[in-house]
C-alpha cells in the first residue's frame, strides 16, 4: 500500500487510466471497490450510459439523446433528498476493450460545475473466484463558499454509495449465474 492506501496495481491503473489535471479551484480524487463478480458482468452494468439507474441509487430516470456514442447526452432525474433534481451529462469515452467509461456533466440544477469522471473495470481474483476491481475518479470545481475538502467529501460519499450499489447488484447477479438447478429425483 502506498501513502494514499492504494496497492501498487491500483496505483498503476490510476496512473494509466485516471489522469485528471485539477486547476487551483478544483478537487480530484479516486475511489476503489473490489467486487465479487466477474468483470464482464460488472462492465455490463457500468457501460450502460443509457441506464445508470440499474445501479446508481440516486437516479430515478434517464433519457438519452444520440446513439450511445461519444458526445451522446443523457438527461438524468435525481431522486429527492439530494441538492439537485436534474443533471445533463455527456458521454466522453466508452471503451469496451479496456473497460473504461468517462462522463462529463454539462448542465443541471446542481453545484457540480466542470465535473468529469472516469470509471475503469479490471479483472481480478477474489477468494479464488473471478472478481472485479472498479476504480472511479473525478475532478470538479469547488463551489463558492465550500472548501476542497468539503467538496471532495460530498462527491466521494455519492461515489461510495454508487460503488456499493454496483457491488450489491453485480454480486446478486453473479450468485444467480452460479446457481444451477438441482436435479429432482
Where are these regions (language model features)?
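Hydrophobic ligand-binding cavity/cleft-lining segments
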Residues: 1-69
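Short, highly charged C-terminal tails/helix-capping segments
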Residues: 14-16, 164-185
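Glycine-rich portal/gate segments that line the openings of hydrophobic small-molecule binding cavities
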Residues: 34, 47-113, 173
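A short, structured loop/turn motif at beta-sheet edges
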Residues: 39-40, 67, 93-99, 121-133
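Beta-strand/loop substructures that line and gate deep hydrophobic ligand-binding cavities in soluble
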Residues: 104-161
Amino acid at each position: 500500500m502506498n501513502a494514499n492506501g492504494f496497492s501498487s496495481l491500483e496505483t498503476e491503473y490510476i496512473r494509466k487510466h485516471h489522469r485528471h489535471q485539477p486547476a487551483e479551484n478544483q478537487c480530484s480524487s479516486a475511489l476503489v471497490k473490489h467486487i465479487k463478480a466477474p468483470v464482464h458482468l460488472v462492465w455490463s452494468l457500468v457501460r450502460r450510459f443509457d441506464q445508470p439507474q440499474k445501479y446508481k441509487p440516486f437516479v430515478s430516470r434517464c433519457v438519452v439523446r444520440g446513439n450511445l456514442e461519444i458526445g451522446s447526452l443523457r438527461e438524468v432525474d435525481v431522486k429527492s433528498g439530494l441538492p439537485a433534481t436534474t443533471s445533463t451529462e455527456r458521454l466522453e469515452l466508452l471503451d469496451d476493450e479496456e473497460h473504461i467509461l468517462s462522463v462529463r456533466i454539462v448542465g443541471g440544477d446542481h453545484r457540480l460545475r466542470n465535473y468529469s469522471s472516469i470509471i475503469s473495470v479490471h479483472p481480478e481474483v477474489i477468494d479464488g473466484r473471478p472478481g472485479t476491481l472498479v476504480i472511479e475518479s473525478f475532478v470538479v470545481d469547488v463551489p463558492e463558499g465550500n472548501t476542497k475538502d468539503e467538496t471532495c467529501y460530498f462527491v466521494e460519499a455519492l461515489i461510495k454509495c454508487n460503488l456499493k450499489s454496483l457491488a450489491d447488484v453485480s454480486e446478486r447477479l453473479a450468485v444467480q449465474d452460479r446457481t444451477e438447478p438441482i436435479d429432482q429425483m
